[in-house]
Design a protein with these regions (language model features):
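Active-site neighborhood of HAD-like aspartate-dependent phosphohydrolases
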Residues: 1-43, 142
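Conserved Lys-Pro-Asp/Glu-containing loop-to-beta segment of HAD-superfamily phosphomonoesterases
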Residues: 3, 101-130
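Short, solvent-exposed loop/turn segments at secondary-structure junctions
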Residues: 11-13, 18-19, 71-75, 106-109, ...
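A short, conserved beta-to-alpha structural element at the edge of catalytic cores
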Residues: 34-43, 138-139, 143-158
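Substrate-recognition element of Asp-dependent hydrolases with the DxDx(T/V) motif
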Residues: 46-47, 51-84, 91
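Acidic, Mg2+-coordinating phosphoryl-transfer loop and its flanking beta/alpha structural elements
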Residues: 118-151
């Protein structure tokens, strides 16, 4: 069975829009920590402009296991747990029913790569390692292109599986 992993920030949720509202005088690391711990940024995020189109499409895929694969952006357990809880709250508030998987940093998403797994992510720092580890990575720029590439990738995986039987 094919597993489709959807990234949250930059694919479903508009992290940058909210992050840019925060104190630009703090260093990036302190600014991010403050955004998570004090501002609970991950609970405040809007949908990406075309997230509904992508979510609607994937919800109609038959025989595909759909999950969330998102980074907490830190190795700090306290900050990581805060990010995880906020992201879970966001998914619940937005009625996104998929199982959520969390990694500490981008490159760890490659641990989920298999020949029958697909990652949709807006960061090449996630897609390239995922692909190198044997999975199928789709660099998300907009829903229309991602949907086209996703459908082709699913056909490709299914064709390879049929040939190997």
């Amino acid at each position: 069975m094919i597993t489709l992993y959807l990234d949250m920030d930059g694919v479903l949720a508009d992290f940058n829009k909210e992050y840019m509202k925060l104190d630009p005088n703090k260093t990036d690391r302190k600014r991010f920590r403050s955004a998570v711990i004090e501002d609970k940024i991950f609970e405040k995020l809007d949908f990406m402009p075309d997230a509904a189109e992508l979510l609607n499409h994937v919800s109609r895929l038959n025989g595909i296991n759909i999950e969330i694969l998102t980074s907490m952006g830190t190795h700090d357990p306290f900050q990581g747990n805060a990010a995880k809880m906020q992201k879970l709250n966001w998914l619940k508030a937005k009625n996104i029913p998929y199982k959520a998987n969390f990694v500490r940093e981008k490159k760890e998403k490659a641990q989920y790569a298999t020949p029958t797994s697909i990652l949709i992510d807006d960061s090449s720092g996630c897609v390239i390692p995922f692909h190198a580890a044997g999975g199928h990575g789709i660099l998300h720029i907009n829903a229309a292109d991602t949907i086209r590439t996703l459908d082709n990738t699913i056909l490709q995986i299914n064709s390879l599986q049929a040939l190997s039987k």
